[in-house]
C-alpha cells in the first residue's frame, strides 16, 4: 500500500499546461490533468556518505532510505515516459574530491546538487528527505516550497495533496514555504522538498524498510 501510494503520486506529479490550484479557507486543493510523459524531473536523494542525515534508534539512516525512495520513483517515472535526473545514484554524497573535512564535503555536496538542478533544463526538482524528532508519535508527509515561487507552491501542493489522498487520508498537513534552506533558495526551477515521514516513528520506519 505504501509504495502504491508513491506510484499514484509520482505518476501524476506535474503538468505544465493543465494545473489548477483552488484555495479555500483551510485547504488547498490541486488537480493535475496530464501525466508525466516527456517531462524532465530531477529527483534528489538527500544526504549521502559521509553525511547520513537522521538515523532511527534501530540504525536506519535517512541517506539510505532517501536513495531507496529516489530509485523507486525514478523507475516509476521512467516507465511513464519521463526523463529522470538523479543527483546521486549510490550511497555516496556528491562532494568534490578535493573536499577534506566533513564540513567541506557537505558544502561541496549541496553546491553540486544545486548545480545539477540549474544546469538540467528540467521541469521540476524534488528533494527527498526524512524527519526525526525525540517524540515517537509524530508521523506523516510534509512538503515545502520556496517563498515567492508560485510554481514551487503548485508542485508542493500537488505532491502533498496526492500523498494525503492516496496513502495518508488522516494527514491534514498543507505545504509550507521556507526560505532558510540552501537548496530550496538556490535551485532556479520549481522545487519542493518532500519530508517522507519520521524515522523516529517505528511504524513509519517499517513502512520505509518494506519493499
Segments and roles (model prediction):
Residues 1-211:
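Catalytic-site microenvironment of enzymes
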